[in-house]
A protein has these predicted regions:
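Extracellular Ser/Thr-rich, low-complexity/disordered mucin-like segments
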Residues: 451-484
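Alpha-helical transmembrane segments that form the membrane-embedded catalytic/substrate-binding core
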Residues: 208-212, 239-279
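Extended charged low-complexity segments that act as oligomerization/scaffolding linkers
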Residues: 262, 276-296
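C-terminal segment of classical bacterial N-terminal signal peptides
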Residues: 17-28
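C-terminal membrane-anchoring or membrane-association module
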Residues: 486-514
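Secondary-structure boundary elements
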Residues: 220-229, 266-272, 459-468
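Bacterial N-terminal signal peptides that target proteins for export
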Residues: 1-14
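Hydrophobic alpha-helical bundle signature of multipass membrane enzymes
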Residues: 32-243, 277-280, 312-452, 456, ...
Length: 514
């Protein structure tokens, strides 16, 4: 049964701060509001470099870069064919079934499994029972519209006759084949692939991928200890659109860009009013379930007990030419996710080495993972973990294409004596139990505190004993000795006291298009 998503959200009354903090009133401060992202502009490299969109029956679309578009189609066919191996007598296998579930475009079906079988079951039950309404609200509101960006591209899907324009004209494919040998999947139970509904709908960008990444980035930001696995599962949901033969890799990459920008805006504008309540609710609920089943008294202890960041967490043995190793732990999750950032497209080395400037809002997504740090320090983490320039779609994306959420949200960060980020170690190189900061006592030195207001970030109450969101006036009270490692702790037993707030309508429609 699909969960009914209520369009309500909540405000938070402050909890007691952790014992390491000095309890004091937190003055409210209003963050500046970021506008809705211009998704057409962010994704416009596609129309500039690879595909000229059709405009009417007399003017069909045109392939601009045959080499890149050939690789795009060949990858789509290879991934689709690999996923069609070892079918049962109903032409189904485990990978197709998971792809069909993801095709429903329901957060409560796709995202819980990212936490592994134990925590995922808890989350699924909480969503179905209405006990995670604040989380459901984030999944409902925090989605990007792909309507305008699809209209700007109007690129044919891989299972169709690609020579036929959406407007009835003829596309110039620059010698590429009009039809591809796509293996279509049948339905499974109530889960349908939707081939008949997508024929007039542009392949670029993928709306399902946009939805999955909108949810996945938000979930990883709220449970950063499991960010590598959450983002690997999110990338699988995007890849499953290729598995079903309805999208190409560039479509998936475009969806990730759009969803990343959406999260930047949402986390910036709705951090105190929506994100913090949802994170507190989710972490508190998971902790209570863990305690009841004797998996530990904190979320951190539970993650360790059920091995959610290893063999007892999200795993995936579906392989292809891009995801060439199974996901079985944090390190492999980061590697598989990173491979899907570029889908093996070659780098234009003449464009490599461009300085990375974190787009506005990106640092907000790291606020719960690194509550000790200021905006410029979180931007430094994003820069240290970013993809190099020169890969498809990077130039128009305003930096969103280059962000590696699996690395940035779960890293061991070292500060020097000036408070600058001097080292960032990620889960593909070191074993981590969650995001952490070494030498956090230097975080408030120099210009760093001022970067919060410069970024337009608002002050916030605590997200709970394990996710302290520190107001600028409270940061000096963070008592840590030299060289002490400050890391995310397990959720405490203190519960949030929440009140209802009036509903807000978004400035534009948030409908996700397939």
């Amino acid at each position: 049964m699909k969960m009914f998503r209520r369009l309500s959200s909540v405000v938070v009354i402050a909890l007691l701060m952790p014992l390491i903090l000095v309890a004091m009133p937190v003055p409210a401060a209003q963050a500046d509001q970021l506008p809705n992202p211009d998704w057409v502009a962010l994704l416009s490299d596609y129309e500039k470099d690879y595909w000229q969109a059709p405009t009417d029956a007399a003017h069909g679309g045109k392939v601009l870069d045959a080499k890149t578009m050939e690789l795009d189609q060949n990858l789509a066919v290879a991934i689709n064919h690999k996923a069609a191996e070892d079918l049962d007598n109903k032409s189904l296998n485990a990978q197709r079934k998971r792809a069909l579930v993801d095709s429903d475009l329901q957060a409560e079906e796709t995202m819980p499994g990212a936490l592994g079988p134990v925590l995922g079951a808890y989350m699924s039950e909480g969503l179905k029972q209405g006990k995670l309404n604040a989380v459901a609200d984030v999944f409902s509101f925090n989605v990007a519209s792909t309507y305008a960006s699809k209209r700007a591209a109007m690129h044919p899907r891989p299972y169709l006759n690609r020579a036929e324009s959406s407007f009835g004209g003829t596309n110039d494919l620059a010698g590429l084949p009009a039809t591809l040998n796509i293996k279509q999947s049948p339905s499974w139970l109530e889960h349908v692939p939707g081939y008949s509904n997508l024929q007039k709908n542009s392949s670029y960008p993928s709306g399902h991928t946009t939805g999955a990444y909108s949810w996945g980035i938000a979930l990883a930001g709220m449970i950063p200890e499991l960010a590598p696995q959450i983002m690997a599962r999110t990338s699988e949901a995007g890849n499953n659109r290729i598995v079903l033969g309805v999208h190409y890799p560039l479509d998936i990459m475009g969806g990730r860009i759009g969803a990343s920008a959406q999260n930047g805006q949402y986390w910036h504008n709705e951090f105190s009013s929506s994100i913090v309540p949802a994170a507190r609710q989710l972490r508190g609920y998971l902790t209570e379930r863990c305690q009841a089943d004797e998996h530990g008294s904190t979320l951190a202890a539970c993650i360790a007990d059920v091995k959610a960041n290893g063999a007892g967490g999200y795993t995936n043995g579906f392989l292809d030419s891009v995801a060439s190793e199974p996901v079985k732990d944090q390190a492999s999750a980061v590697r598989v996710y990173t491979a899907r950032l570029t889908y093996t497209f070659p780098q234009n080395t003449s464009q490599s080495g461009a300085d990375f400037m974190a787009p506005r809002g990106a640092a907000d997504v790291l606020r719960l993972a690194y509550p000790e740090l200021h905006a410029d320090q979180r931007n430094a983490i994003l820069k240290a973990t970013a993809l190099d320039s020169g890969y498809p779609l990077w130039q128009s994306s305003d930096g969103w294409q280059r962000i590696n959420w699996a690395k940035a949200l779960c890293a061991r960060v070292t500060l020097d004596k000036n408070g600058d980020v001097s080292k960032v170690e990620t889960a593909d190189h070191v074993t981590l139990t969650g995001p952490s900061v070494i030498n956090a006592q230097y975080a408030n030195i120099g210009k760093h505190p001022a970067s919060d207001s410069a970024a337009g970030e608002n002050s916030s109450v605590s997200a709970g004993p394990d996710l302290a969101v520190l107001h600028a006036a409270q940061r000096p009270a963070l008592m840590v000795g030299a060289g002490v490692l400050v890391t995310i702790l397990g959720a405490g037993a203190t519960k949030a006291v929440m009140g209802k707030r009036s509903e807000k309508k978004r400035a534009e429609s948030s409908t996700v298009r397939p």
